[in-house]
Structures are given as structure tokens and as C-alpha cells.
Amino acid sequence: MARKGILGTKLGMTQVFDENNKVVPVTVVKAGPNVVTRIRTTERDGYSAVQLAYGEISPRKVIKPVAGQFAAAGVNPRRHVAELRLDDEAAVAEYEVGQELTAEIFSDGAYVDVTGTSKGKGFAGTMKRHGFRGQGAAHGAQAVHRRPGSIGGCATPGRVFKGTRMSGRMGNDRVTTQNLKVHKVDAENGVLLIKGAIPGRNGGLVVVRSAIKRGEK
């Protein structure tokens, strides 16, 4: 089955009850409506993909080259544009320019991967950023309690290895959480209730796609 996807907005978390009256924590995602603005084919572009546009924006804020792309597709300008890769040419036939996608492309019980931008934490130490345990609180430890410790040898190798976990900026990265279950699809309001937490802040842009490792239930 071809992977499906849609752009949306993370609204926040809440909790609902399932059929067994157990509390289920869910993230509310405003999914779509998206509009198809371009279709990529292997023959013409070297790969298969569909370009989706989402979100309202004033036409005054759209630069002319981008406005021309929307005009060529025959749709009003949108705030966000993203390409979703398709598995093969057969999946391309399911889309056409100007087509509108809503939350109904998913069903209750489907499994999805959600991609978003994680919350930025600023400059963080190794204990917060990488989970280091720190150093002793007593036995002569002085002003080193949250330090990482050694970052390499002196003469051998005489340098710090690339990729060594150290302090630095944390968060504000593209993160994907896989195999989340769609608890409920509210087609009337264009909302997905996804079990568990997803990356990013409330109001942030997210991409919801069919789970690549599990697929639909």
C-alpha cells in the first residue's frame, strides 16, 4: 500500500477514554486541508513525489516566483509547501494538481510517523543534552559535579575525536516519532487524535505520514 501523508498543525495534548473506559493520552493535530500543487515523476524529474501546500497566507507576502508556481497550479497561495516522496509511479496516479487532501486519508487505528521541529532548549550541558550522570557529590569533588569529565587523551591521540558528546545547543532539530496510533479521525473538524506525544511546540508545523515500518493496521 502506498504511503500517504498530510501537513498539519499541532494543537496540543489532551486525554480521552477508549472503549474499555481507560484514559488515553492523545495529541490533537489539525490535519489539512492540503492542496496538491505539483507532481514529480521519475521520467521527468528522476523521482516520484507529490508537492503539498498548507496554511493561509496573505498574497501580498508571497514573492513573485513562488506566486507564479501557485498560479500555474491554479490554486491560491499557501504558507507551507513540502514534498512527500512516493513509493512508485503507481502511487503518482492517485494524485492530480489541485486535488484537496483532508484528515480522512487516514482511518481509526492506522499507524503513522509524525515529523516536526523539536523545542529549542538553547545552550545545554552534557547532563541535560546527553544524559551524563555527572560526577560525585562528595569525596573531594569540588566544582566538577556537572562537568563531563575527560574528552580525550593528551599525547595519544592528542586530539578530540569527532562526534564526542559535549555541551552545545540543544533542540530545534527535525525529529520523527514512529509508529504512533491514530486513536480517532474527526473528519468534520479535520482533526486527528494521535496516541502519545509528537515533536514540537503547540502551533508548530508537523508532517503526518503512514508508518514506514508498520503500515496501517
Curated annotation (Swiss-Prot):
Annotated GO MF terms: rRNA binding; structural constituent of ribosome
One GO cellular component term: cytosolic large ribosomal subunit
Keywords attached to this entry: Ribonucleoprotein, Ribosomal protein, RNA-binding, rRNA-binding
InterPro entries noted in UniProt: Ribosomal_uL3, Ribosomal_uL3_bac/org-type, Ribosomal_uL3_CS, Transl_B-barrel_sf
Gene3D superfamilies registered for this protein in UniProt: 3.30.160.810, Translation factors (2.40.30.10)
Keyword Ribonucleoprotein: yes
Gene Ontology biological process terms from the UniProt entry: translation
Family: Belongs to the universal ribosomal protein uL3 family.
This protein's name: Large ribosomal subunit protein uL3
Protein species of origin: Mycolicibacterium smegmatis (strain ATCC 700084 / mc(2)155) (Mycobacterium smegmatis)
